[in-house]
């Protein structure tokens, strides 16, 4: 019986949804704004979202490098943004596109 309860408890933890946390965000296009921050995986990938703003997903490819996608309207598809994004040396909460120099930050 204990084993069954243990298996059920582990399954519940694995199936538990991720929860968004309040954060402060910045993008080159939208400036500073309050947002929701949600971790996407163990590598450090994350998503930021806010009403009236695009939703951004930062997918960690390797330490310090990421691919970024954006959803520009509710229910829309994620569109890959140009270039690899590098973690900023000045602020580790920020990512900067090598190609366009667009910046995305979440604190």
Residue ranges of model-derived segments:
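Active-site bordering "gate/hinge" segments
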Residues: 7-8
């Amino acid at each position: 019986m204990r084993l069954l309860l243990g298996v059920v408890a582990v399954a519940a933890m694995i199936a538990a949804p991720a929860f968004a946390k309040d954060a402060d965000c910045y993008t080159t296009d939208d400036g500073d704004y309050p947002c929701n921050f949600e971790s996407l995986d163990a590598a450090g990938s994350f998503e930021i979202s806010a009403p009236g703003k695009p939703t951004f997903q930062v997918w960690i490819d390797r330490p310090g490098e990421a691919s970024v996608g954006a959803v520009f309207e509710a229910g829309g598809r994620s569109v890959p943004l140009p270039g690899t994004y590098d973690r900023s040396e000045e602020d580790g909460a920020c990512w900067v596109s090598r190609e366009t120099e667009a910046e995305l930050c979440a604190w």
